[in-house]
Amino acid sequence: MENELVSKVKAPVPGNQTNTLNEAKCPVGAHTLAGARSNANWWPNQLNINILHQHSPLSDPMPEGFNYAEEFKTLDLDAVVKDLRHLMTDSQPWWPADYGHYGPFFIRMAWHSAGTYRIGDGRGGAGSGEQRFAPLNSWPDNGNLDKARRLLWPIKQKYGRKLSWADLMVLAGNVALESMGFKTFGFAGGREDVWEPSEDIYWGPEGKWLDDKRYSGERDLENPLGAVQMGLIYVNPEGPNGKPDPAAAAVDIRETFARMAMNDEETVALIAGGHTFGKTHGAGVPTEYVGPEPEGAGIEEQGLGWKNKLGHGHGYHTITSGLEGAWTTNPIKWDNGFFDNLFGYDWELTKSPAGANQWTPKNGAGKDTVPDAHDKTKRHAPFMATTDISLKVDPIYGPISKRFHEHPQEFADAFAKAWYKLTHRDMGPLPRYLGKLVPKEPQVWQDPVPAVDHELVNDSDVAALKAKLLASGLTVSQLVTTAWAAASSFRGSDKRGGANGARIRLTPQKDWEVNQPKELAKVLPVLEKIQHDFNAQGGKKKISLADLIILGGCAAVEEAAKKGGHSVKVPFTPGRTDASQEHTDVKSFSVMEPKADGFRNYHQKGQPRPAEEMLVDKAQLLRLTAPEMTALVGGLRVLGANYGHSKHGVFTSHPETLTNDFFVNLLDMNNRWQPSGADGVYEARDRQGDHVKWTATRVDLIFGSHSQLRAFAEVYACNDAKEKFVHDFVAAWTKVMNLDRYDLAKKKAAAN
């Protein structure tokens, strides 16, 4: 897809906006001004837990109980597609369509909505309509996509809450492809809009657009980032840092697309398929003609940016990337024109009217073969970006490109599946996919699990299985740790992981260091024996290992609460199934291996971020609130869930008993804390006798150090909070155990 890098735009510092308001302080608004110093300004090293409080119902305009999935099911999808097809050629004078067709524009919009996804932490992607908000709406690479969304507004307005912006942007890309003769693989609805920018996504360390401080060494890109520069979706089309070196650009392409979960064939298919359509825009030098991005524009622009002073400011005079030209002879039709031109000409370096580095056929070849986008009397030669030439000269991409050129149907199939993957990668498992256009064929990247094909266990079965689990010789610690390891692999970002599928018994999860493979190898056979014995009783009733792992954890929590004097029933709902190794993409799952899990007091050495920061990041991926995170850490410590049976943070003389001892002893003023000789480890000494009472990590001590977390800890340390703590822990535990149970959400919605 066209990468509209605004390489020549004056680079504003993110956050520096034109203040069009009267700067005289109003007595009402004086304390809400953006310029006021925040706590983060005063104490930049303070742990930020705000990411655990984002997307609150208080910022959601939808009514209480609103269920987008149910609303989408009532949508007339055929009517939406019909309206989108009409829009494709309904050129508007305020933003005329290139070649009379908006298709390429909407493909770019959908691509850039989805293309922010990165596998490192699962964040980014098209799943929540974030392109509407800062910073994405003002990224240089998203130049003029504000107009694409405004073109879609009448359709969004027509269908209202039945159709989210997130779904509409992807669907518009699909319909655009279909309207130009391409057969897509499918489309799923189900992306629910957010109503504020997500604060948990780390876009990079840079303080200005198009900077690249994210690199170290020769060209080592910081994890989990995917793009090469701040404000780009993926790579610089002119080449690394604007240097027109196709071989070097191929290195960037391979790394960036791999971090978007794409292999070499998918990468070639996506670039070539996207560049079969449309053109780039560089009618003039951006710094001379183009105004501020949407977030920096004046209030009268009403959320639009990049106002262009050249000529009409649109159409023939459009300026976006600084690159100028089309790749094919028919930019609004699916064909093999991209490869025809890539291999049909020898290419030489030239400059666009804006001064950007790009390529043109040597010796004037190809002259007048490409129509002008707005003037039928004009013709042009085709163009290629440096990153397009990479697909020809790279020793891996080159043969793939040649094969696709010689086998057009193979190319079409590859692009269809790669586009589907690109636009659906962050949607999670198939139960979240909605609508009549969903393909029946599951893809391995969707982490498929088998459908339930047996009768589920009832309450009496559950009670009997709990008794067997507790009498199996496995400890409370082992049962809790195994259930947590399985369930906490979930990522709310791209909805991957979780206990369903019991992939903790498969490669690679069974070998992850954090899961203590030797210990896991002792626990799983015991659970498998209990499962086998139950399922061998005959009849249709069975239990999966995935269900049994979670049931074991629930039984252990109940037992630990009982030992602490509290009778509690931990909710358990069967219905999980066991995935196969064949349906588990090892490479894709490998990137999910935790480098830290503060809930288990695990932190790999050499991590650039402090342990407490990684705890908050983990909690956010688990969709936990700060109080839920607090309750879980305190409970898991006394239950003995620490990695390697470490005693750090186990502030109790009654291990494997669910008590509030962690909080009581952490806040005990008879203790004084000091660093120990070990890195990242602290010790509590009695103020009177000076003997060591406890040891702790930074994750443990943050609940006494951070003022807000300490406030939560104080709640649970109070004398009247013992029962409250147990119930809060059970509620948070149950939430984590069921994070991947989208089937339960569907049943709940159907019941309502």
Swiss-Prot record:
Enzyme class, top EC level, equals oxidoreductase
- PTM note: Formation of the three residue Trp-Tyr-Met cross-link is important for the catalase, but not the peroxidase activity of the enzyme.
Question: What CDD domains does the entry give?
Answer: catalase_peroxidase_1, catalase_peroxidase_2
| Co-factor: note | Binds 1 heme b (iron(II)-protoporphyrin IX) group per dimer.
Describe the reaction catalysed, as an equation. Answer: H2O2 + AH2 = A + 2 H2O; 2 H2O2 = O2 + 2 H2O
Q: What is this protein called?
A: Catalase-peroxidase
Q: Residues of crosslink Tryptophyl-tyrosyl-methioninium (Trp-Tyr) (with M-260)?
A: W111-Y234
Keyword Cell membrane included in the entry's annotation: no
Instruction: Give the keywords, sorted.
Output: Heme, Hydrogen peroxide, Iron, Metal-binding, Oxidoreductase, Peroxidase
The answer to whether UniProt assigns keyword Iron to this entry is yes
Q: Which SUPFAM superfamilies match?
A: Heme-dependent peroxidases
Q: Active site annotated at which positions? A: H112 (proton acceptor)
Molecular function GO labels:
catalase activity; heme binding; metal ion binding
Q: What is the lineage of its organism?
A: Bacteria, Pseudomonadati, Acidobacteriota, Terriglobia, Terriglobales
Species the sequence originates in: Koribacter versatilis (strain Ellin345)
